[in-house]
Amino acid sequence: FLDYGSGYSLLKAIDSLPPNTKNVTFVEGDLFYTEEDFTKIIESKKNVVSINKEPIYANKAVVLYLDTQQHIHYLYDTAHKALNIKEPFCAIFNSAQMWKFNDTNYLQRVRKRLTNEQEEGTNLELIDAYFRDLENGSIDIIPIETWYNCNTVKDYHHVYKFIKAHENN
């Protein structure tokens, strides 16, 4: 995990799925979101990709974009310097980094097709490969209303203030 991050955890989880597992929900561990938003993902009958309302900056965003065929792609710069989409696209979003995989047989096939280099990459290697060729009708793009990526102490302080402000509601 120390070398490969959450991608390694995702691969190990897929390798260990019990037979007849209906779906897999994968969420980055440093996120803050509401139960209401998470419930939208869980209750969806489709595969799910999530988006948030944050601006897209290369130093922190995971980009989800739709190519001209409406296929989903992900982009992230591990160096946090610049993002480069090398093809025409129809839409671009900031990913909320929460996914639901509704076809575990397909998920396992995608996992088995990954190269060693992809396995050592980010979790987006598998996620991009899974969602890229799915039919649009089988995917819900769910906006997450309350979302914070807690990468820094400052981010955690922001979330703490949010929680305190909403404690009595």
Residue spans of the language-model regions?
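A short acidic, often aromatic-flanked loop/helix-cap motif at beta-alpha or helix-coil junctions
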Residues: F1-G5, I56-Y57, A82, W147-N149
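Alpha-helical elements of Rossmann-like donor-binding domains used by nucleotide-donor carbohydrate transfer enzymes
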Residues: Y8-K12, K40, K46, A129, ...
